Curated annotation (Swiss-Prot):
UniProt cross-references to PANTHER family, sorted A to Z: SERINE PROTEASE INHIBITOR, SERPIN, SERPIN B10
Subcellular location: Nucleus; Cytoplasm
Family that this chain belongs to: Belongs to the serpin family. Ov-serpin subfamily.
Top-level taxon of the source organism: Eukaryota
Keywords, comma-separated and alphabetical: Cytoplasm, Nucleus, Protease inhibitor, Serine protease inhibitor
Single GO term (MF): serine-type endopeptidase inhibitor activity
Name this protein carries in UniProt: Serpin B10
Amino acid sequence: MDALATSINQFALELSQKLAESAQGKNIFFSAWSISASLAMVHLGAKGNTAAQMAQVLQFKRDQGVKSDPESEKKRKMEFNLSNSGEIHCNFQTLISEILKPNNDYILKTANATYSEKTYPFHNKYLEDVKTYFGAEPQSVNFVEASDQIRKEINSWVERQTEGKIQNLLSDDSVDSTTRMVLVNALYFKGIWEHQFLVQHTTEKPFRINETTSKPVQMMFMKEKLQIFHIEKPQALGLQLYYKSRDLSLFILLPEDINGLEQLEKAITYEKLNEWTSADMMEVYHVQLHLPKFKLEESYDLKSTLSSMGMRDAFSESKADFSGMSSARNLFLSNVFHKAFVEIDEQGTEAAAGSGSEISFRMKVPSIEFNANHPFLFFIRHNKTNNILFYGRFCSP
């Protein structure tokens, strides 16, 4: 499972860089873990070149095109037989079960499904495997005659699965009578902080988008002992903020320079991120933390992005090979839709009660100010599995 987490986290960084290219100056927020799990359901029925390309993009085959030293690559090959499709999907089964375990300290609602035109019936073996490994049931629907009705039904299902938080995942023109197969993936997250911010300390402050432009935000504030890490190249400050029970953490990577976000994004690799956020790099400080209160709801049509990353054949009517899914010819993936929703506020969740803690700085621990008043990167990690659940960029309030 460790190696699967490595693959998913590497995919998160690759995908973030691709999304950043087409979203300059815009916020980014997505769940690489959830997208990976959804695509793995499709990979389960892929064969030949189609399967190989998907495995490469999803970093299941980490021996090609990965920037890392030979020793670490050798170690990864030893710990995970990446050519073994069965092992990959067994690991997903374990991972999904671990991450989605019922928990009173955070809400994580997912909606993952594959919808295929009914004239392309699924193999029984494929249906059984998807249910076993992913707890999902691919749906055969009538895109040819009732595409808009199907779109509305999909949106209603996603809304129910996410308790009303994710609405209208599929836009009016997202599917039509020529649609063969679509993958829908939506995720809603809300957690309770270990140390909550006091509402009375939240004030309006300027958020500096660049050196000349700023926008007002509701800036939260707390004084607390927190874990800080320093990044030297490019210069940035990192912070770990635990959610209650410490199952999850929010990491913030704040460039020293107001205009330093792009440089930081380009510098990040899987190995560097692992190094920066390792326990050895963490130091406890008395932190005066200023963090914007924000809500992000981002939607993505991932077809062009995934194609540009190398997953081309899956979207091609003439080249796609999903013979492990259906015996019908010309079945291909029409699109992959993803939507993720997160709220960052004082308590961390609407239902949280009680007051936050405030400390006086008397112990011999160094003090530092962490003022997230300009663009930063952030991600939410499931600590037990070391999985990046969400990855984001906040640069435009």
